[in-house]
């Protein structure tokens, strides 16, 4: 047997398994597991097998960390394909560094004018109906979609959508978006989302532009779905993708090929050459992610494709989402020298004209009556504002990224979430103005969920999705789109039932989601005001108001209930929470809103009742087993809300009344309190006296509170505080103590409450599971250095802490906070320069990013203006000279120290740990990998690449280079 061979580096001393992929760029073989010291002979290939790796795709990913390659040649859940790349011009860029041959020059194609069909070609087309069409439901308009909410029924079949239309409408959605409805690749017609038969991406690989595919249903079923939607007043938006076809060109419909003038004419002259993501010419005329780039400027193709769009609207489509829209040229974009017509970039203007002409002909909606938006993932040269003008709307990928980052960190600061992060476009002398009203916003897209697990299901659970949705749907600008996650999905089982065609998770109709959708519809064009009540960045309030409507949505990202007492634009009155099943009531009196929101909860206020009331608080310092309230000696008691600090509150809808508090078992009873318009509302069990604040009440009981703060850079899931006095008396009971209060941005607060005078106390912070700080002793009532942070460089075993006088000093010393992150790199390979490139939560400019200077200790550091999150991405590189780390996420406050440990680039929790990894690195051994290429005669398998990944912590990822890996050497006299 003749074999091609490649010398690959492995570390046998590590004793860890790895996996490899063999590919030919457009095709991927089976993944093989390989143990250390094993020789390996491979003699089989298989197309379109997914990768199990979560290794990075290339040297730079899109600013949103989701990508345009959801429809790529292999299961996009693996990241072997090129992501949206703000800096992909370097030599080791995915697809760019390999030897590609452009398509041969083709003869000039004789085509008719846009919108006309020659007699000779008419038979090639599946023509849309030309009979006059009855009008749709008059309630379904572009405005009803724009001012409402869209459900993205990802991978739901047409019949499934129709069967669930009543629920969709009842949940307050004004539109439903389908997955692509065109004929698609079906060489391996699996019906799973993920796994060996996971073929969700097939419907992003068109083989023809006619309605119907094996995954979603037939043309008749599509029409039935549209008819049902019309009955319920729900619009239908179709996901379309004119930019590319499947790379399996043998599956392309003959009619499509002939309409374009032949197989070569269907694609751009450079349409099978991998392009970058920063140059407009490469963005629009080159292949993206291994998918051949359609010549969307070919008028024969345009006519064929526009007939597909006409058929869609004739059957009932009310709008379109254009996949990979920024990969199709705008009229003022450059044209390659391969073409003589400098004005050929006409796809979008001609699309508008064709749909308008069809509207006049048969009575369908005109272009401006349709809701059309394009997927324009933000990055260098995205030209978002210009696409808004030519298409009508665009996505808001950067805002989605910031929102997910905020949710995963629990930091809902207005400063972080107010700006939609879109900008005017002046690329070619004209000014296009970015418009927030033309945005489609999301918490996550299907690209995020299926391709970028780190920023979605690994870090954003269903409750966070609902909170994020409540934010974007409550806001004034844009149109929110709710991505339907797979049914029964979770972080442990992200694909849930793993079925194409089935309905997704029911969270799309959760009570909070429905309430916010109806709130959005009611608020219309009302003004918005965002605030963090009481300065609490874990709570966000979105107020909407004008002369005719008013309301507010409050989102609490903390895990515990939070009490609200804040100034508001709402008029005085009583506001019941509109979330179904909630009994919460909020009061507004003298312009102050009062109430409470449960942990990770959402409150929707849009209905005002006349009247007034009082919130009365009771301090349970006797540790009763539950607290209830009895008002005016009523037979029934009222439940109270535990504020998790010893206080319980109850809302009474009256200004004057008597109230007493009782233990849940009725054995303990407080004095009776007389509440008046002028009285205080804070009570204790020790007397009938009323106070005007918690602090005043606790002082009246002789209670002194001494807060101490802990900076949780260790990423503990919970922080416990154990305390004792010098005499041995415990402050919070036995070990591990009490749960500290999460204040957000990594800070936790422990309140030491004592009666009488004390001279000092002592604390230990711990995670409740065996990891703890050293004893923090000698804290006095007058101590100012009450802000504690772990010193990772000095710790060994128990964690040593340093004490600071404020949060800012601690954050500066550690180089991290909720709003900035310092990332560190040690240059073990002797690069002549070190640059940092970032995307997602923040950007440092185009590739290769910002050049760094060496610190005194030999490390390089860069301060990033964003807190750690799953969307804070960084690549250290040597300035576009072929060397770089893989994609690294700075997702927490600890693991920010990066170096090559002799095997791969890894993150460490301190400089000390990183340097110890170098000192303990073992010797490198080498193994030879052999592969027998049974498809050597296939042009797509002319070259074979080896990609390596694996290891417990991914240390073997990119071992021989980023995807597609290293070109294997063909042995002489072999068939390869």
From Swiss-Prot:
| The protein's name in its UniProt record | Alpha-amylase
- Which SUPFAM superfamilies does this one have? (Trans)glycosidases, Glycosyl hydrolase domain
* Binding positions (Ca(2+)): 243, 284, 293, 327
Tell me how this protein assembles: Monomer.
Gene Ontology molecular function = alpha-amylase activity; metal ion binding
Q: Tell me where the signal peptide lies.
A: 1-33
Its top-level enzyme class, in one word, is: hydrolase
The family note in this entry says: Belongs to the glycosyl hydrolase 13 family.
Keywords of the record: Calcium, Carbohydrate metabolism, Glycosidase, Hydrolase, Metal-binding, Signal
Q: Where is the active site?
A: 323 (nucleophile), 375 (proton donor)
The organism's superkingdom is given as Bacteria
Q: Region (Disordered) spans which residues? A: 45-98
Task: Give me the stretches of Acidic residues compositional bias.
Answer: 61-73, 87-96
Query: Which free-text remark accompanies the cofactor?
Result: Binds 1 Ca(2+) ion per subunit.
Q: Name one GO biological process term.
A: carbohydrate metabolic process
The reaction(s) this protein catalyses: Endohydrolysis of (1->4)-alpha-D-glucosidic linkages in polysaccharides containing three or more (1->4)-alpha-linked D-glucose units
Required co-factor(s) are: Ca(2+)
According to the UniProt entry, which residue ranges have a biased composition of type Low complexity? 50-60
């Amino acid at each position: 047997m003749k074999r091609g061979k490649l010398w690959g580096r492995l570390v046998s001393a590590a004793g860890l398994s790895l996996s490899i992929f063999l590919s030919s760029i457009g095709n991927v073989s089976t993944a093989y597991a390989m143990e250390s010291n094993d020789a390996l002979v491979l003699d089989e290939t298989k197309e379109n097998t997914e990768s199990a790796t979560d290794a990075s795709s290339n040297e730079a990913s899109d600013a949103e960390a989701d990508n345009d390659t959801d429809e790529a040649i292999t299961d996009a859940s693996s990241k072997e394909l090129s992501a949206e790349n703000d800096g992909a011009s370097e030599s080791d860029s995915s697809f760019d560094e390999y030897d590609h041959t452009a398509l041969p020059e083709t003869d000039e194609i004789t085509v008719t004018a846009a919108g006309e069909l020659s007699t000779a070609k008419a038979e090639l087309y599946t023509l849309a109906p030309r009979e006059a069409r009855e009008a749709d439901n008059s309630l379904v308009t572009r405005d009803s979609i724009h001012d409402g909410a869209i459900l993205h029924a990802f991978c739901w079949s047409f019949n499934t959508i129709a069967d669930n239309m009543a629920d969709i409408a009842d949940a307050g959605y004004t539109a439903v978006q389908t997955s692509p409805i065109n004929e698609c690749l079906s060489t391996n017609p699996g019906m799973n989302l993920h796994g060996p038969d996971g073929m969700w991406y097939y419907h992003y690989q068109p083989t023809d532009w006619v309605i119907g595919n094996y995954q979603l249903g037939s043309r008749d079923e599509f029409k039935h779905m549209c008819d049902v939607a019309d009955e319920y007043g729900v619009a239908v938006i179709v996901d379309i993708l004119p930019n590319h076809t499947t790379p399996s060109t043998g599956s392309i419909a003959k009619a499509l090929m002939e309409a374009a003038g032949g197989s070569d004419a269907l694609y751009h002259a450079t349409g099978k050459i991998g392009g970058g993501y920063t140059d407009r010419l490469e963005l629009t005329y080159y292949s993206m992610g291994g998918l051949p780039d359609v010549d969307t400027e070919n008028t024969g193709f345009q006519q064929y494709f526009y007939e597909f769009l006409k058929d869609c609207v004739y059957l009932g489509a009310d709008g379109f989402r254009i996949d990979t829209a920024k990969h199709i040229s705008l009229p003022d974009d450059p044209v390659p020298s391969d073409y003589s017509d400098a004005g050929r970039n006409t796809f979008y203007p001609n699309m508008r004209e064709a749909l308008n002409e069809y509207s006049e002909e048969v009575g369908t909606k005109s272009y401006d009556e349709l809701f059309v938006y394009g997927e324009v993932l933000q990055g260098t040269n995205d030209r978002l504002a210009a696409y808004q003008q030519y298409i009508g709307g665009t996505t808001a990928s950067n805002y989605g990224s910031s929102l997910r980052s905020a949710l995963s960190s629990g930091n809902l600061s207005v400063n972080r979430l107010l700006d939609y992060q879109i900008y005017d476009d002046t690329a070619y002398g004209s000014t296009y103005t970015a418009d927030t009203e033309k945005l489609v916003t999301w918490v996550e897209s299907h690209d995020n969920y299926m391709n970028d697990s780190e920023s979605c299901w690994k870090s954003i659970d269903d409750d966070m999705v609902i909170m994020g949705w409540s934010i974007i749907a409550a806001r004034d600008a844009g149109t929110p789109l709710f991505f339907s996650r797979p049914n029964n999905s979770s972080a442990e089982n992200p694909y849930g039932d793993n079925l194409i065609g089935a309905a997704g998770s029911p969270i799309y109709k959760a009570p909070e989601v429905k309430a916010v959708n109806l709130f959005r519809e009611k608020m219309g064009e009302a003004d918005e005001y965002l605030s963090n009540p009481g300065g609490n960045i874990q709570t966000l309030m979105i107020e909407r108001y004008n002369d005719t409507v008013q309301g507010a949505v409050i989102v609490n990202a903390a895990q515990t209930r939070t009490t609200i007492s804040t100034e508001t634009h709402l008029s005085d009155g009583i506001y019941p929470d509109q979330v179904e099943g909630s009994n919460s009531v909020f009061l507004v009196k003298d312009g102050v809103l009062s109430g409470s929101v449960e942990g990770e909860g959402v409150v929707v206020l849009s209905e005002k009742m006349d009247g007034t009331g009082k919130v009365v608080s009771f301090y349970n310092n006797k540790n009763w087993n539950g607290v209830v309230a009895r008002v005016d000696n009523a037979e029934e008691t009222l439940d109270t809300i535990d504020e998790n600090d010893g206080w319980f509150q109850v809302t009474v809808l009256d200004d004057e009344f008597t109230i007493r508090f009782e233990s849940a078992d009725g054995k303990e009873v407080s004095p009776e309190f007389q509440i008046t318009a002028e009285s205080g509302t804070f009570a204790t069990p020790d007397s009938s006296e009323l106070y005007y604040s918690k602090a005043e009440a606790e002082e009246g009981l002789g209670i002194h509170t001494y807060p101490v703060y802990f900076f949780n850079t260790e990423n503990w899931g919970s922080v416990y505080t154990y305390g004792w006095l010098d005499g041995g008396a415990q402050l919070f009971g036995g070990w591990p103590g009490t749960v500290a209060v999460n204040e957000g941005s990594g800070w936790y607060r422990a309140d030491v409450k004592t009666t009488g005078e004390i001279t000092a106390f002592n604390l230990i912070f711990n995670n409740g599971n065996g990891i703890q700080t050293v004893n923090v002793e000698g804290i006095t009532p007058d101590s100012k250095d009450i802000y504690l942070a772990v010193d990772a460089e000095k710790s060994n075993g128990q964690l040593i802490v340093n004490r600071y006088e404020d949060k800012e000093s601690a954050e500066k010393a550690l180089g991290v906070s909720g709003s900035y992150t310092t990332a560190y790199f040690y240059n073990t390979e002797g690069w002549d320069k070190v640059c940092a490139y970032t995307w997602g939560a923040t950007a440092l400019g185009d590739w290769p990013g910002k050049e760094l200077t060496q610190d005194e200790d030999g490390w390089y550091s860069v301060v990033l203006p964003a807190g750690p999150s799953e969307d804070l991405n960084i690549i250290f590189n040597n300035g576009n000279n072929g060397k770089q780390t893989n994609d690294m996420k700075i997702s927490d406050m600890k693991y920010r120290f990066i170096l090559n440990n002799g095997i791969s680039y890894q993150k460490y929790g301190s400089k000390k740990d990183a340097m110890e990894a170098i000192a303990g690195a073992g010797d490198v051994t080498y193994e030879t990998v052999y592969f027998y290429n049974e498809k050597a005669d296939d042009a797509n398998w002319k070259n074979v690449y080896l990609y390596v990944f694996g290891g417990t912590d991914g240390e073997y990822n990119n071992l021989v280079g980023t995807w597609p890996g290293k070109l294997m050497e063909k042995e002489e006299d072999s068939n390869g």
